[in-house]
From Swiss-Prot:
This is Perlwapin. GO terms for molecular function: serine-type endopeptidase inhibitor activity. Its main location: secreted. One of its GO terms (cellular component) is extracellular region. It comes from Haliotis asinina (Donkey's ear abalone). Pfam families: WAP. Residues 1-18 form the signal peptide.
Length: 152
């Protein structure tokens, strides 16, 4: 009877050695050798979390904030400042390589349109993409304006 319980439990739970998550927002890394389901759908998770299938383990993880991580040129790594977007203030996102994550202002998709030379006063209407309404991006150096993005 004990043998049946062990064999049957292993068959139901499954086993895996270090599954890596491939889904956006799912935490990377190795997971326990015993597979388990702590959630079956997003409805099983608290508000602000979603059910993430890591390949072997279903767990509730914080939903990522909107926007994309900027291109990052990092100085030497000094450890994580954040583990996920919820660790960052406001609309900042947790970005970077594992072990070197920092909070950054997010970017919206698309790129800024090419500009012709503009003379006149240097006025800054935005500081980053999320200062702009809708899908507009913060573009230029001087002046900095909210503009409709180009999509390649």
């Amino acid at each position: 009877l004990i043998l049946c319980v062990v064999v049957c439990t292993a068959a139901v739970l499954g086993t895996a050695a270090g599954y890596e998550s491939q889904l956006p927002g799912c935490p990377p890394g190795a997971y326990p050798a015993i597979c388990a389901r702590y959630c079956y759908s997003d409805r099983d998770c608290a508000s602000g979390y979603y059910c993430c299938n890591t390949g072997c383990l279903n767990i509730c993880v914080p939903k990522p904030k909107p926007g994309l991580c900027p291109s990052i040129t990092q100085s030497p790594c000094r450890g994580n400042v954040c583990n996920n977007d919820q660790d960052c203030p406001g609309n900042r996102k947790c970005c970077g390589k594992p072990g070197c994550k920092r909070c950054y202002r997010p970017k919206k998709p698309g790129s800024c349109p090419a500009r012709k030379y503009e003379a006149g006063p240097c006025v800054v209407y935005c500081d980053g993409d999320f200062d702009c309404p809708g899908d507009k991006k913060c573009c230029g150096g001087c002046p900095r304006l909210c503009e409709k993005p180009c999509y390649d």
